[in-house]
Every structure is written in C-alpha cells, then in structure tokens.
Amino acid sequence: MLRDCYSACRGALQNGGIEAPDFEALCLLEHVTGYGRSGLIAHGDAPVPEEQQALLRELTQKRLTHYPLQYLLGEWSFMGFPLSVGEGVLIPRDDTEVCTDLCLEHLKGKPNAAAIDLCSGSGAIAVALAKLTDCHMTAVELCEKAFYFLETNIELNQAAVTPIKSDVMSCFLDFEDDIFDLIVSNPPYIKSADLPTLQKEVQFEPSLALDGGESGFDFYEAILCNWTQKLRHGGAMVFELGENQAAYVAALMRNQGFENIRTELDFGGTERAIIGIRQ
C-alpha cells in the first residue's frame, strides 16, 4: 500500500541520519508514484506496483549514501520555477533568492534593461530574472555539463535568456564597455582547503562550481577587475557571498569605484548577498 511504502522510506531515511526524512520520503514517493502529501492522505490504501516499490527502494538506498535528493528527483524549484538538475551542475539553493531579490529591486522601473549572469550554472538566477522582468538577459557558463542544464532550463521555462558557453575570466573581452545595467554572479567562493570538509551531499556537486581558490575570493577579484567597465554608470554589481566574505568583497567593490554598497542577510542571519552601484 502507498502508506506502507511511505512509512518504509521515511523509516529508512530517519535511521540513516537524513535530516528531513518526512519531507524527503514524500518527495521520493511523489517522484515514483505521482502521489504527493494529499494523495497519501486520500489514497493511502492504494496498491503500489512492484516496479514502483523496487524503484522507491533503489532511490532510498542511494539517498542513504548522501547522494543529493535533487539529483535523484532530476528537478528542483527556484523562486517557483522548475529547474532540471543532475550531476555536473550546482543545486539551486534558497539562499540564492537573496541575491536574486537584490537584482529584482535594482531592475524595478528599468524597462528593457540589459543584464548578465556570470557563472550561471543551472541558470537559476538568469531564468528567474528573465521571467520576472523584461530585461535582456545573458548567461555565461563554462562547464559543459552545467551548460547543458542551463540550455535545458531556458527551454523548460521558455525564458528569454541568451546562453553563452565561455569562461568569465576571459570572455569580458567579447563585450563592449558600458552596456549592462546589471551584472550578477553566484561564483565559486569556497576556499580550496575547505572543500573536503563540506557536508557529504555537497561532495557530489561539481568542484568547479564551488572552488574559489586558496582565499575563496578568486572570482570576486577577477570579475570586479575585468567586468566593472562593462557596467553602465548607475548599473549594479550583485554577488552571492559565503560566510564572513562581506567585508572583503565590499572593500574590493569600493576600490573599483562602487558606491551605495550594502549587504542582505539570509534566513540564518548570514550576509548572503551584496550590491554596489557603479558611479
């Protein structure tokens, strides 16, 4: 029965130390059977075909290895938009909504603004901005696997985003100066030495999307050095931040002539995003 399958999955996840076994069991059950929470309540006695039971057991066992739930499901939501995800692309996180909200705030009242998302990954930020504003959105991603998901998610959401497969460290040369109203990036910002200490689930995500170099600031420094002149005067630079990175990134931005620099906190109280205006 459906109820028994859910209970078995939840129990296995709970015993395996998975943090939110109730929620994850529901996610896996819905993925396999099509029944979510309301379906479980209304149809708890419904029979479950053996092949679905076998698949649910298989996915549960894989999750117990700390393989990410999002990769098992193959899809995750960001700001209400479905995104295809899998091995080779960073999983969209709620924290990134803080960064995206700063972008939306800046773009408000600026029709037909030009914006670019650097280190775009799955395209979470780019897709959300393209769907929620009328900006002309460009997204840059180097990794082949991540670029596949970027293109897939643009199509999935019918988002007006131009994807470019290139390296943000060099492709600034392909753009004229003073053309963007917004440059946003959720760059790799973990110190190289800290990568092995990250939670087990994160170990399955691509290191290229996480590794910010010895200091964790390699991409902030490079983007500010090479991309600032691509912003129009009055344009905004927005970054997602790691823990304890706000002060240094703010100093970098001031050195590049940015003003009105401010940070925003995530739900945990961490300074998670920063914005500055080019004067």
What do these predicted ranges mean?
Residues M1-T33, R37-I41, V48:
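Non-catalytic accessory regions of SAM-dependent methyltransferases
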Residues E243-Q256:
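Short alpha-helix
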Residues K165-S166, L241, L265:
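Short loop/edge segments at beta-strand edges and connector loops
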Residues E144, K200-R232, A236, G242-N244:
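Glycine-rich S-adenosyl-L-methionine
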Residues E30-E105:
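Conserved AdoMet
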Residues R254-Q279:
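Core SAM-dependent methyltransferase catalytic element
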Residues D94-P196, E201, A222:
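Conserved SAM/SAH cofactor-binding pocket of Class I
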Residues L13, L107, I154, W227, ...:
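Conserved hydrophobic residues forming the short capping helix/wall of the S-adenosyl-L-methionine
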